[in-house]
């Protein structure tokens, strides 16, 4: 065999092996003008992707984009919201108050005497800060938050509440943003956390932020309440799913009625859940099964609804809230990737197929 021919053959073989070993190139997520994330609570994929149980959400999944293998990071709720915004659970694995520290005697810090208890105020950047640095805007809309920027653990309606956490309509454990020190310490950032009265006004006026986190109250997000004055549809499982499904359907319709949705700019509404029901530890993508706070929060529904994107798409790629964060960072063209959103070597990839533009 001639030397030149042998070298060429070796090069061809090497190239063939390299092409087989290289992972597929994932296309860049298109630039988005608006991404609104609606979060519901504590339901498994199979409970919701059933037209008989949740016709609105199941219908949206069939019509738009369905992430069929999407997972939470942990149980219970609080750390999943933090993970969505900051790329990590930061050691949180309970629903204690956002100011709780080890040894704190506050009733909202029930686990503070446990070994390894972490500061629930997170001293790390969040998605809102990335957006600010890029000249973009953000807001959190939380139903029954008593006032813009209110740094409270719970808020109740006297008509149904007995003053306990189990009857509170608003719960800070379902906000995420309030855990970050930069929100707690800066009134200008805290005032970006508002109630649904402001959501109504912003949708009517067309003054929409680049990113919005939208969380209904505990009757409307499928979490549920327990108490003598709590309506049956807020505590009975099937009725609770129907109520939350109706809330999601209404929110999506109202967002789709805005001029921004009908414009040339790209707009996405993501309907997701914080965690699955029960104690399922199913997870993916930079989770650590034996970790106390990042072990996987179960298989959950996640629907991506876009004004110019795919229709009738079921995407079986494994994703979680870190994947969604990475996708939003790319869609908004912000600098850097927060926490586990950077862990492509651990399976955290963008949700490109669900955000592509037709």
Put a short name on every predicted segment:
Residues 21-358:
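N-terminal pro-sequences and low-complexity stem/linker regions of secreted or lumenal proteins
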Residues 6-16:
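Bacterial N-terminal signal peptides
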